[in-house]
Amino acid sequence: MFDEDWVYFQAPPAEMTFINRIIEGCDYLGVVTALDGRKGLGFVRTTKDTAGETKELLQSLPIPVRILSRQEALAAAGQQ
């Protein structure tokens, strides 16, 4: 259900809409989905080709964004 190629992240919950808008503006990168919006956990449905660029973009934003592994994200969301 949760692909290893997707980019998982944690950011301040109030910034989830901002992240979604930025990714939407880059049509080819992927689609943002909240894993647990109250905790600021989300992921971008990427391909192997766009995952690296998506990580770089998220880390370049003027807000704190932590890139997580799939396992870390699911554990933080209580979905192990």
How does the language model describe each region?
Residues D3-E56, R66:
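Amphipathic, hydrophobic secondary-structure cores in small proteins
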Residues V32-T33, I63-A75:
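Conserved short beta-strand edge segments in small beta-sheet-based binding/regulatory domains
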